[in-house]
């Protein structure tokens, strides 16, 4: 579909759990929900592009994710991770969303192939970037952003993500302060 583009078709499905394949075959939250007010993008492009974008409609008063959607490019694992994390996000407060872990996503998919484990980190970093994007759209400063969505640029998840909208937003905010 236009929302999911698999670039690694030669990989087949070896190593993918039946649960993950079922999620990919039956995802319901592809695309950007109408009226989205937050979005994020994470991914890599070295040795093949794998990326995901998350979109959310968030309620300002309750700081809750009402609806979530995604677009992916790459492999089945990134599509499964994006779909599952969108399902987890719906109805969550921002604090609950930020508490979603790689283990939660891995468990929900009954695992991902060992060589695709980075896609779980992409999903979690995309959630963090989604919350960060919403806060910045609401006028949060860099200091306020760091208080809610701290970033360690030397952490493994951050280094895995060659492209990260949250990192780009931070750079823009730092440049504006300079």
List each model region and its residues:
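C-terminal binding/interaction regions
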Residues: 1-34, 39-41, 59, 92-96, ...
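A short catalytic or substrate-binding loop motif that flags glycine-/basic-rich loops and adjacent residues
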Residues: 33, 45-49
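Short beta-strand elements
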Residues: 50-60
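A short interface-forming secondary-structure element
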Residues: 57, 68-75
């Amino acid at each position: 579909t236009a929302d999911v583009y698999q670039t690694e078709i030669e990989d087949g499905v070896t190593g993918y759990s039946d649960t993950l394949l079922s999620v990919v075959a039956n995802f319901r939250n592809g695309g950007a929900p109408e009226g989205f007010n937050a979005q994020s993008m994470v991914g890599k492009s070295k040795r093949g592009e794998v990326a995901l974008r998350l979109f959310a409609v968030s309620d300002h008063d309750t700081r809750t994710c009402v609806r979530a959607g995604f677009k992916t490019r790459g492999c089945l694992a990134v599509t499964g991770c994006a779909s599952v994390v969108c399902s987890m996000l719906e109805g969550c407060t921002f604090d609950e969303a930020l508490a979603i872990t790689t283990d939660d996503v891995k468990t929900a998919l009954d695992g991902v192939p060992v060589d695709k484990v980075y896609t779980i980190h992409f999903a979690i970093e995309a959630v963090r970037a989604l919350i960060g994007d919403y806060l910045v759209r609401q006028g949060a400063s860099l200091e306020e952003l760091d208080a809610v969505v701290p970033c360690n640029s030397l952490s493994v998840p951050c280094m895995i993500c060659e492209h990260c909208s949250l990192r780009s937003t931070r750079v823009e905010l730092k440049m504006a302060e300079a």
